[in-house]
Amino acid sequence: MTVETFTPTPLLFTQGAANKVKTLISEEGNPRLKLRVFVTGGGCSGFQYGFTFDEDVAEDDTIVEREGVSLVVDPMSFQYLAGAEVDYQEGLEGSRFVIKNPNAATTCGCGQSFSV
């Protein structure tokens, strides 16, 4: 009998997102800050993404580091975000962090909510 282990696909923290986080943390003057990405119920498609800066990291959080800054995800949110890409975009709609999520079956027009 063989036992298979599950290794989730990591979250991709793009260069653009890391650079913007670094800039925002520098402007805030608090090097302990990390970008926390989370999923909550709501939005027009059932779930929505959230972003906040946080100094605290829980023992079971997933941490992705790039360019000397950290992206943090709690375990409940990670199950919806495994394999996703966190990026920062500037365009006609303004500047914002965006998530390209391969787990999302549908997304709303603004890209901030999704269903699985």
Curated annotation (Swiss-Prot):
Gene Ontology MF term list: 2 iron, 2 sulfur cluster binding; 4 iron, 4 sulfur cluster binding; iron ion binding
Metal-binding recorded as keyword: yes
UniProt remark on cofactor binding: Binds 1 iron-sulfur cluster per subunit.
Binding site for iron-sulfur cluster: 44, 108, 110
Cofactor(s) annotated in UniProt: iron-sulfur cluster
Keyword Metal-binding appears in the UniProt entry: yes
Domain of life (superkingdom): Bacteria
InterPro entries: FeS_biogenesis, FeS_cluster_insertion, FeS_cluster_insertion_CS, FeS_cluster_insertion_RrpA, HesB-like_dom_sf
Signal peptide, first to last residue: none
Annotated Gene Ontology cellular component terms: cytosol
Pfam families, A to Z: Fe-S_biosyn (PF01521)
Keywords of this entry: Iron, Iron-sulfur, Metal-binding
GO biological process annotation, one example: iron-sulfur cluster assembly
Similarity annotation: Belongs to the HesB/IscA family.
Subunit composition and interactions: Homodimer.
Function statement: Required for insertion of 4Fe-4S clusters for at least IspG.
Name this polypeptide is given: Iron-sulfur cluster insertion protein ErpA
Organism the protein comes from: Azotobacter vinelandii (strain DJ / ATCC BAA-1303)
UniProt lineage: Bacteria, Pseudomonadati, Pseudomonadota, Gammaproteobacteria, Pseudomonadales
